[in-house]
């Protein structure tokens, strides 16, 4: 699965692999992309694929109900390649094997003082209303402002490893966590 995830040779013109947008073991490239599968003019923040198989829906616009569907659609509509089912299953297995790296905000497994201060802000602003549970997501779609383009809103992403997934918000308009607030 890892081999297929990183293999650009099979896609149209042989230049793009899954790793192109999701480098470093399925994380995010920190870019906004305007993909044609949901219409032109809808730039979206590239999500990390960490825990994508247990935090549906997939893609920030929620257009894929499950990660298995998103993997196959990614090959078909982004890389313009029709994968064999066994290949797609291998990529699914690889993505399911990904685990978070230790946070630099933990000291001997405990929150640092900065992280404790951040937790107070998180609680005060009720971030946990949407970012809750073991993966810090309620697995729902939310409209998060007046300028939301999609009527159904946007997927609540996991906050696991959010310290390394800038920019933030569905369209990447917040370059830092401070800009989110």
Feature-to-residue mapping (PLM):
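Periplasmic c-type cytochrome electron-transfer domains
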Residues: 2-181
């Amino acid at each position: 699965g890892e081999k297929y995830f990183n293999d650009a040779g099979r896609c149209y013109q042989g230049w793009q692999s899954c790793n192109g947008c999701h480098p470093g073991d399925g994380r995010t490239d920190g870019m906004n992309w305007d993909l044609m599968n949901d219409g032109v003019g809808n730039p979206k923040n590239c999500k990390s694929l960490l825990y994508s198989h247990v935090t549906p829906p997939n893609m920030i616009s929620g257009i894929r109900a499950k990660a298995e569907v998103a993997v196959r659609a990614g090959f078909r509509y982004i890389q313009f390649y029709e994968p064999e089912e066994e290949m797609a299953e291998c990529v699914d297995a690889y993505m399911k094997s990904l685990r978070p790296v230790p946070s630099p905000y933990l000291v001997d497994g405990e929150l640092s003082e900065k992280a404790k201060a951040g937790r107070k802000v998180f609680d005060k602003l009720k971030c946990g209303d949407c970012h809750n549970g073991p993966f810090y997501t309620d697995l729902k779609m939310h409209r998060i402002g007046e300028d939301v383009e999609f009527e159904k809103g946007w997927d609540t992403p996991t906050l696991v490893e959010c310290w390394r997934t800038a920019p933030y918000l569905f369209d990447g308009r917040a370059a830092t966590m401070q800009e989110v607030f």
